[in-house]
Regions:
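Active-site mouth of glycoside hydrolases
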Residues: 3-182, 186-193, 198-203, 208-215
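Active-site core of glycosidic bond-cleaving carbohydrate-active enzymes
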Residues: 184-189, 193-263
Length: 263
């Protein structure tokens, strides 16, 4: 709407606590309302298309949504995950001739959501290791981008990429990122200055950052940060002070500091 707005976002999965993966509009609305009251203004659906209930609740609450299509491409992350079908011929009666399942599933996600005012970006994947800039991955990203723009050319297309956190962040994956409208950085705050220097025209945002986790009512000294060698000492619990993190992430404070210093 012509107004600059900073993302205060969260990545959320499709479960609702004790309800598990069973969708319930009231539970989803409650979850999003709590997040909004906390200061959240945007959501990334990790790492799959959202339920209609979540999209409706987000629109009702005025929250922005980045809808994510895939957690893997053809490489797969688990033996029986979506990677088995990514480049398999789609057999759905509404699939187009020559469609892979990834074509059909991506197209139907966008056709469903293109008129929802909450959606502001489409994501083509999360931490896709095979998106490394080789010929196969470049052909794939161009195909997926074409599928998106055929249906909706009004929204930006992005990915959540973790390859930028290794070394100085450079590599073949930059060829993939260069084709995106917006580049999502997963756990790559330490390299953001170098990325900006190499690619001054890229639009960047933190698609996945802190991964700060807590065990309710379990407290450990604030000066002690969770690391791999003290898990058993803590009975595999994490501090409710907010000073713990997953091995690949940062505490919330560390992520906010990196963001604050670049305002």
């Amino acid at each position: 709407n012509g107004e600059k707005m900073k993302f205060h976002g969260v990545s959320i999965h499709h479960d609702n606590g004790a309800l598990g993966a069973e969708e319930n509009y009231k539970a989803t609305y409650r979850k999003l309302k709590l997040l909004k009251d906390m200061g959240v203004n945007s959501i990334r659906t990790t790492h799959n298309p959202a339920s209609p209930q979540l999209l409706d609740a987000a629109a009702s609450l005025g929250l922005l949504v980045q809808e994510e299509a895939f957690d893997t491409w053809y490489g797969g992350k688990k033996e029986y995950d979506y990677g088995r079908f990514f480049e398999e011929e789609a057999t759905h009666p509404e699939a187009k001739a020559g469609d892979f399942w990834s074509d059909y599933d991506l197209r139907t996600m966008i056709e469903r959501g293109k008129n929802n005012p909450a959606i502001f970006m489409w994501s083509l994947g999360n931490e896709v290791s095979e998106a490394n800039g080789d010929a196969h991955s470049l052909k794939t990203i161009k195909r997926l981008l074409e599928r998106v723009k055929e249906v909706d050319d009004s929204r930006f297309v992005t990915m959540g990429m973790d390859q930028f956190r290794f070394g100085d962040g450079s590599g073949g994956h930059e060829k993939i990122a260069d084709l995106l409208d917006v580049v999502g950085l997963n756990y790559s705050e330490d390299n953001i200055d170098g990325i900006r220097k190499r690619h001054p025209k890229w639009r960047l945002y933190g698609s996945e950052t802190s991964s700060a986790t807590r065990t309710r009512d379990s407290y450990f000294r604030p000066d002690k940060e969770w690391v791999g060698d003290n898990r058993r000492v803590r009975n595999f619990e994490q501090s409710d002070y907010g000073n713990d993190r997953v091995p690949w992430g940062k505490t919330a404070t560390a992520s906010w500091t990196a963001d604050r210093n670049r305002l």
